[in-house]
Amino acid sequence: MKKIFIVLLLSVILIAGVFAQAEGETATKDQTIVLRLADNQPDNYPTVIGDKKFAELVEKYSNGRIKVDVYSQAQLGDEKSCIEQVQFGGIDFTRVSISPLSSFNPHLNALQMPYLYRDPDHLWKVLNGEIGQYFLDSMKASNFIGLTYYDSGARSFYTTKKPIYTVSDLKGLKIRVQESDLMMGLVSSLGAVPTPMSYGDVYSSLQSGVIDGAENNWPSYDSSSHYEVAKYYSIDQHTRVPEMLIASKISMDKLSAEDVALIKKAAKDSQQVQIDSWADYAMKSEAKVREAGCKINKINDQAEFAAAMAPLYDSMLSDEDMAWVEKIRAVK
C-alpha cells in the first residue's frame, strides 16, 4: 500500500511538472519581444522618422509580438559606440552613416567615394539593386545584418571665417570629419587638416575655434545648429554617403527565421518614408539657414575639387572595390 502511494505521488508530481513546463513554453511564445534601436540624431530628424516607421512596421507585421524602442539623440552613445554595441549584441539595431561603419567593413568605401554618383536617381538605382544588396549582405562578416539604406543627401563644407570657392581656400583649415580613413584622406587631399571628433562636440569646437569648419548636409547643418557658429556654407557636394540601418547578428540569431524575415521586410518598407522625409526636411533646412543670414555660395569649379580627390580611388580602394566602383558607374 505504501509503495502504491509513493508511485501515485510521483505520478502526480511528474504530471504537474509537465503542465508547468507546457505553461512556461506557452508564456515564452506569447511574450512580447522588446528590441532597442539607437540613433544619434534628434527626434524630428529624417533618419529617426525612418527608424520610427521601421518600428511601427515591425510591430504591425508581428501582430504586436515584437516591439522596437527607438532611442534618438545619442541616448545610447555616439555612432561609433553604437556600432560596437550592436556588433556585440548590447544594442539590437542602429542607424548610422556608412562612413564610420567602413572602419568595420572597409569595402563600404566603394559606396561613398567623392563624386561617384551622377545624381540621387543614380544613387538609389545602385543602393536598391544588386550592388546595394551585396554590400548589405557583406555586413555579416563583421557580425551585423544589413537591413536597408536611408538617404543623407550630399555633403558640402561649412566654415566659420570665410567661404570656400577654390581648393586653395581650404588650405590649412582644420575641418571636422567623421572617424573614417576615407574622410580624413578626402579633406587632406584638398590641403585642409582633417580633425576627427564625435558629432556632439562639433558645435563647441566651431564656437571656440578648435576647428575652422566641418562638412555635412543641409539637415545636419540646421538640426545641429552649426549654422549659428559657422555662417559660410559652400556647396561642393563632394560626396553622397548613404545611411544604413543595421541589426546585431547576435540578436537576430535568437529569433526565428520568420521573425528575421519580417524585420527585413519592415526595414525595406520604411525606406520610402525616410527618403520623402529627407527631401522635405532638406528643403526646409536650406530655407531656414538662408533666412538666418548664412552666406551660401557654390564653388567655382567642381572639376577642380574632383581632380584633387581623384587619387583617393587608388589609395583607398582595393582592386576588388575598384571593380565595384566601375559597376556603380555603369548603372544607368
Protein language model features and the residues they cover:
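Short, low-complexity disordered leader/linker segments with a strong preference
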Residues: M1-V34
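N-terminal secretory/targeting leader peptides
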Residues: E23-H122, I131, M139-K332
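Conserved glycine-rich "GG(E/T)P / GGGxP" loop and the immediately following alpha-helix
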Residues: L136
